[in-house]
Amino acid sequence: MDVIRTAIGLMSGTSMDGIDVALIRTDGRGFIERGPFMGVPYDADFRGQLKRALELSRPLTDRSERPAELREIELELTLRHAIAVTAFMERFGLAADAVDVLGFHGQTVLHRPDEGLTIQIGDGGELAKRTAISVVYDMRANDMVHGGQGAPLVPAYHAALAGKFQQAGQAVCFVNIGGISNLTFIGTDGRISAFDSGPGNTLIDQWVEMQTGRTYDPGGEIGGRGKVVASLAERYLQSPFFRGNVRRSLDRGDFAPLQSEEASLEDGARTLAHVAAASIIKSGGFLPETPALYIVCGGGRLNATLMAEFSVMAERLGSRVLTAEEAGFDGDAMEAEAWAYLAVRSLDGLPLTFPGTTGVGAPVTGGVLATP
């Protein structure tokens, strides 16, 4: 009988807005019992430190390199994760010995799949010591060692969640609109395909922050007052990324931000929401079949302008669009839940990535285990 474990997943994504903390009970296979979720936002000063970490990481050629300033940021990130875990457990009445493992993503500061290089800062050993809970971390690297792109990793969890829709004979596509958007397609035959689909919130967030000092477009309100600037949209949508037959994982630096003089605040936000939606549809053209259903998670599902654009485009192809909540899930918690699920799979030596998800030659496990 497969062992059911209690796991907490910790996710700090490319949007760099905070830590998502989620608990599940799972056997790392088909059994999933979803528990509580909590978000812990970063303050502006620490978001600035993470942006500095991106700059410090550019010249690195080894995933273990930590120049002194980057190491300081890594330790601060780890401390904030430890504090988040402690706050989560106090809030929901959990003791350390009630949790079997933490799945710790860390913060991606460099991702160059063509060079076989990915760097996530975050000290798993230090986190295990501070929380008194075993930690699985650095889950992307082994995939890249074996020729994969190192992303996306969440598809294994999406496939486990998709069971009820497959029973209805539907091809389902999960869309995670984070800083970068990615797709997980589960066909009617159960086959999984997954890849990054293009820019998600990153370009919108960068634009709004540059123009207003706010870190995002709340509810898509700013974009909702603008119009699409076709020439700017086409500049993004004509990227070689959308033309090649080989899918690859993306870094937040793969698409250059708009320049301040290129559009009004509202038109820029609307154009970039259109680009985010159209990117999903364009990349969806590489799927084995058109999904009957798109399930949207990640922060982008809260941008009404982006969602309206995407829904119209999908409906033209005969597809239905639901938010994660409309499908019975929690769109805020899903990535953190996935990291908890992957940690349990790692403990059991089960594959985290597959040829259809990262391009790795054969299914491989991953992750490094740190004990208290």
Swiss-Prot record:
Disulfide bonds: none annotated. Keywords: ATP-binding, Carbohydrate metabolism, Kinase, Nucleotide-binding, Transferase. It is an enzyme of class 2 (transferase). One of its GO terms (biological process) is peptidoglycan turnover. InterPro entries: Anhydro_N_Ac-Mur_kinase, ATPase_NBD. SUPFAM superfamilies: Actin-like ATPase domain. Its EC number is 2.7.1.170. It catalyses: 1,6-anhydro-N-acetyl-beta-muramate + ATP + H2O = N-acetyl-D-muramate 6-phosphate + ADP + H(+). It comes from the Bacteria. ATP binds at G13, T14, S15, M16, D17, G18, I19, D20. One of its GO terms (molecular function) is kinase activity. The keyword Phosphoprotein does not apply. PANTHER family: ANHYDRO-N-ACETYLMURAMIC ACID KINASE. Belongs to the anhydro-N-acetylmuramic acid kinase family. Catalyzes the specific phosphorylation of 1,6-anhydro-N-acetylmuramic acid (anhMurNAc) with the simultaneous cleavage of the 1,6-anhydro ring, generating MurNAc-6-P. Is required for the utilization of anhMurNAc either imported from the medium or derived from its own cell wall murein, and thus plays a role in cell wall recycling. This is Anhydro-N-acetylmuramic acid kinase. It comes from Rhizobium johnstonii (strain DSM 114642 / LMG 32736 / 3841).
